[in-house]
Design a protein with these regions (language model features):
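Flavin (primarily FAD) binding-site architecture
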Residues: 69-84
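Core beta-strand elements of the Rossmann-like FAD/NAD(P) dinucleotide-binding domain
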Residues: 55-66
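Short beta-strand segments that buttress and anchor functional surface loops
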Residues: 3-4, 49-53
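General small-molecule cofactor/ligand-binding pocket signal
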Residues: 30-32, 173
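A conserved short coil-to-beta-strand element within the FAD-binding core of flavoproteins
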Residues: 33-47
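Rossmann-like flavin
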Residues: 1-28
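Short, hydrophobic/aromatic-rich segments at coil-to-beta transitions
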Residues: 45-49, 106-108
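C-terminal catalytic lobe of FAD-dependent flavoproteins
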Residues: 13-19, 23, 80, 85-130, ...
Length: 365
């Protein structure tokens, strides 16, 4: 055997991305969610994008010197709206994961080779385990989990682990499904012989005359490097980037963390830890909120009820719900349950619906 080490996301990818968005906003960035582009055109030295609020359906024009198409699997679709011709395009691979009760008390990731030859993982998620994945060619980024997907994952895990009883569909708590945008030449036909060898790397295409950038492929693992490349290209197009060398992401200085830990210990913060929690309250608040966790500590000092778990069966406390309302751009309940937290990924839908405190959380949000 061998041991391989890598990074992992304690919450989920959506929370990971939002942390970047929130940090950028704290540094002066303007961001909006539930806004869709209806297309863009060039007028003189400016791009004019027609955008629509997906909630109230109102439209607005956004003017910009540079247009960056960072739409992920929808890059090609948006380029068609703007009339951009590129050397690359995306092909899509669908991947799914199933969330089931914890399989082993070991916190290490288990890795196997599935029947199709690709790596297959069991990833610990507190009291749950995330198993998968699949790699299925699809035509569209709009995908969902099928019975064949579930059968493939369950059969592979049951073949490779000696479980007290085989996992069945009744053990599935939640599901994850999405596509990997893989890079192909724009003129390549759809008959790709070696699907697993398609590149997971990223490519940035630049139209310097129109000041238009398209980002193809890539992974979250490399997102900061992609951002650095984009910044260099935009600066090369004559756009002055303020505070380009500032550190706007990541943990605060270690001295800030020490001060937080000292305050948390003095107020005996971990005595409020709920039985459902997979980690200490001290660790979780720091990991999720960084220096902003001081505000949560103060809320708990002022009113100890703020440390109560609000939604029964989850580890999220009352002051976190209040914080999410003010700071985390919650528009729909699903934003909180699935994107800002992992509640919808570790609890069955019917358990969430019937959880004590859910309605109060909805009123707060």
């Amino acid at each position: 055997g061998f041991e391989y080490s890598d990074a992992y996301l304690p919450d989920n990818d959506a929370r990971f991305v939002f942390q970047f968005v929130r940090s950028a906003m704290d540094q002066g960035c303007v961001a909006a969610n539930y806004v869709e582009s209806l297309g863009a055109h060039r007028v003189g030295d400016l791009w004019i994008t027609l955008a629509r609020d997906a909630i109230n359906r109102e439209t607005v024009e956004i003017r910009a010197k540079v247009l960056i198409n960072a739409a992920g699997p929808f890059v090609d679709e948006h380029n068609r709206l703007t009339g951009e011709q590129t050397e690359h395009r995306h092909l899509f691979s669908k991947g799914i994961h199933l969330i089931v009760p914890r399989i082993t008390s070991n916190r290490r990731i288990l890795a196997f080779f599935a029947d199709d030859g690709r790596l297959f993982f069991v990833i610990p998620m507190g009291t749950r385990a995330c198993i998968g994945t699949t790699d299925t060619p699809v035509e569209s980024p709009y995908v969902e989990v099928t019975e064949d997907d579930r059968r493939f994952v369950l059969e592979n895990i049951n073949k490779r682990l000696n479980l007290p009883r085989p996992l069945t569909s009744s053990d599935i708590i939640a599901e994850r499904c999405g596509v990997r945008p893989l890079i192909a030449a724009a003129k390549a036909d759809g008959d790709i012989r070696d699907w697993l060898r398609l590149s997971r790397r990223h490519e940035i295409e630049v139209d310097r005359v129109k000041a238009h950038l398209s980002i193809f492929g890539g992974k979250l693992t490399d997102c900061l490097n992609v951002g650095d490349e984009i910044s260099e290209i935009v600066a090369g197009l004559g756009i002055v980037l303020p505070r380009q060398d500032s550190r706007w992401y990541g943990e605060p200085h270690r001295s800030v963390c020490k001060d937080y830990l000292r305050q948390a210990e003095r107020m005996n913060l971990d005595s409020y830890r709920s039985s459902e929690a997979a980690e200490s309250l001290t660790d979780r608040l720091w990991r999720r909120y960084g220096a902003k966790a001081f505000e949560l500590l103060e809320a708990i000092r002022q009113d100890p009820r703020q440390a109560e778990s609000l939604i029964r069966g989850t580890e999220y406390i009352r002051c976190e719900i209040e914080w999410a309302k003010r700071q985390e751009m919650i528009v729909k309940l699903e934003d909180f349950l699935r994107r800002r937290s992992e509640i919808a990924l570790v609890m069955r839908r019917e358990d969430i619906r019937n959880a004590a405190g859910l309605m109060e959380a909805c009123e707060i949000l």
